[in-house]
Regions:
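Short glycine-enriched loops at secondary-structure junctions
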Residues: 19, 80-92, 134-144, 184-190, ...
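Catalytic domains of carbohydrate-active enzymes, especially glycoside hydrolases
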Residues: 35-53, 122-135
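Surface-exposed, active-site-proximal loop segments in enzymatic domains
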Residues: 91-107, 146-157, 196-202
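Second-shell residues forming the walls of enzyme active-site clefts
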Residues: 3, 25-29, 50, 56-76, ...
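Preference for extracellular/luminal or secreted protein segments
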Residues: 1-38, 46, 259, 281-542
């Protein structure tokens, strides 16, 4: 091929990021999300994929049509990180409980968990397809064996390899039945790290024998089941390569994944804009090293033009043989052919609306109901003189589940509990400086009984800051003063397990792995009584 053809071919292997919204002014993360002008320019030059975030399901549907129109063809890989259903990222679609919810259910009812995991995958695939996506960046195949993991946490299907692998495989079956591509991630395993690779480069110091027993087992299982793609992890695994992170390591991607595991599908990098990579090499060299190591697709290069230039130069110099380019292009064509055929078979059954069907709505409720946990006494009586619901969220600026009409706010408010929402950029409930056994500054809360609600889970870019907060001491402080009347934990099961044991049997408490309105509604119903109503209205003003 000539230089122009080669550049267009290399461009097909890049996946850039864009907003699901139509307008540039609506971009949530303009640092990473390309403008419409840049998108049109790159798509015209042959960019082969787009990862989308933000907007409604209907907006996403139109956005995907627009992107294909700008590209001038339908052979685009259009994907999203929808590990918890399409509604996790796009409003109006179904947001499902995190995968670890089914991992906990699996220990008590494995048959039910497996059935729900497959339905979970099928729901995700059906909605993704109706919205215009053909590639779901899930399932997570990391085994969350480290409770202190700041970034995987509830995204994993479990903390036991066999259960995590079985549930991820069931989810993948649902994706395949729904006609979209799946992606097992993050190879060779990100579950036993205490660092966030969005911010730094983790090192996984285990023997190969241990890695085979824990980290690698779900990936072997998904590959045997025919998963379409595998995403790399930005971490160093000295048992395989002591120098380079897996994303840039031929020993991991070619020797282990491609040759030893005999994986014939697409290998895609995790986002190359993450600090674990940008802290090592520039945008051009990162793309070259990843491709040289064995990756087929380059996700979110820090600079798409520099990435294309560098890979073309590496091909021209002979650093990377032209056969590698041909192999990656063929794998990409094969993947598109598979999902195009499956999508065609599902086309007739798909309703035109991008939003959720009644069956999908029912699945969301069933998943919340099946995975919630409770303990303790009878529902809380409305406080005669008023009380406080102390709500801790781990990211108020990206908090779609806690609007003024959210059940976690509205239901307690209707019962006489005044909401106080704590977050990193706002009010702090803590004494400054810390006061040991009495960490809460109760003067900031006011008088009355306290209903505690914690919305805490593993999230990227937080570096585990929430783990340092003294919630056990806070609960003991409130108990000593006879002020704690109930507790709800949404998200992290490890936080729930550490706090629930501190409560006497007389205090009702409940847990859901999910944080969405459905989970709030069910937990508030358990704690405050089903006969209560939200009672929203004039209490919320501009």
């Amino acid at each position: 091929m000539n230089a122009v053809e080669q550049r267009r071919a290399v461009s097909q292997l890049l996946v850039v990021r864009a907003s699901g919204h139509a307008g540039d002014h609506q971009r949530r993360y303009p640092r990473w999300e390309l403008s419409n002008g840049e998108l049109q320019r790159l798509l015209a030059k042959g960019i082969g994929g787009v990862i989308l975030l933000g907007g409604t399901a209907t907006e996403l549907q139109q956005r995907c049509r627009t992107l294909r129109s700008w590209a001038g063809h339908d052979d685009l890989l259009l994907c999203a990180d929808v590990e918890e259903g399409v509604g996790q990222r796009f409003e109006g679609a179904t947001w499902l409980v995190p995968p670890m919810a089914l991992g906990r259910l699996q220990s008590n009812d494995p048959e039910k968990a497996m059935v729900l995991a497959e339905r979970y995958g099928r729901c995700t695939a059906d909605q993704a397809r109706r919205c215009g996506l053909n590639w779901v960046l899930a399932p997570v195949c990391d085994v969350n064996s480290n409770p202190a993991n700041p970034v995987i946490n509830v995204r994993a299907w479990g903390q036991i390899p066999e259960a995590a692998g079985a549930l991820a495989e069931a989810f993948q079956r649902g994706l395949q039945a729904g006609g979209v591509l799946g992606c097992a991630k993050h190879f060779p395993g990100h579950g036993d790290t205490a660092q966030d690779s969005h911010l730094e480069l983790p090192v996984l110091r285990h023997s190969r024998e241990r890695l085979e027993q824990i980290e690698l087992r779900p990936f072997r299982r998904l590959i045997a089941a025919g998963v379409d793609s595998v995403m790399t992890a930005h971490l160093v695994v000295p048992a395989f390569d002591a120098e380079w992170p897996a994303t840039l390591s031929p020993r991991v991607l070619t020797d282990l994944l491609r040759n030893s595991f005999d994986f014939q599908g697409l290998i895609v990098t995790d986002a190359l804009v993450m600090e674990a990579i940008t802290g090592l090499v520039g945008p051009g060299e990162a793309a070259v090293q990843a491709f040289e190591a064995g990756a087929d697709l380059i996700l979110m290069p820090a600079d798409a033009d520099k990435a294309i230039d560098a890979v073309c130069a590496a091909l021209d110099s002979g650093r990377i043989p032209s056969l590698r380019l041909e192999q990656s292009l063929q794998r990409r064509r094969d993947a598109l052919r598979r999902c195009s055929g499956a999508q065609a078979r599902n086309e007739a059954a798909s309703p035109p609306d991008a939003g959720e069907t009644s069956d999908e709505r029912q699945l969301a409720l069933e998943l919340v109901s099946a995975t919630l946990e409770r303990q303790g006494g009878t529902p809380i009586e409305p406080p005669a003189g008023g009380g406080v619901t102390l709500i801790r969220v781990d990211g108020v600026l990206a908090c779609p589940f806690l609007r003024p009409d959210a059940p976690a706010i509205g239901w307690p408010t209707s019962c006489g509990f005044r909401p106080i929402i704590c977050h990193d950029l706002g009010i702090s409930p803590w004494h400054e400086p810390p006061q040991g056994d009495n960490p809460l500054d109760l003067d900031r809360l006011g008088d009355g009984p306290v209903l505690l609600q914690l919305f805490l889970r593993g999230n990227p870019f937080r570096a585990g800051r929430d783990r340092d907060e003294p919630w056990p001491a806070a609960i003991r402080q409130l108990l000593q003063l006879n002020r704690l009347v109930g507790m709800a934990v949404y998200g992290c099961p490890y936080r729930w397990e550490s706090l629930r044991v501190l409560l006497p049997d007389t205090i009702p408490a409940a847990y859901s792995p999910g944080q969405m309105a459905d989970a709030q509604q069910m937990l508030m119903g358990l704690l405050l009584g089903d006969e209560q109503t939200l009672g929203l209205g004039s209490e919320f003003t501009d």
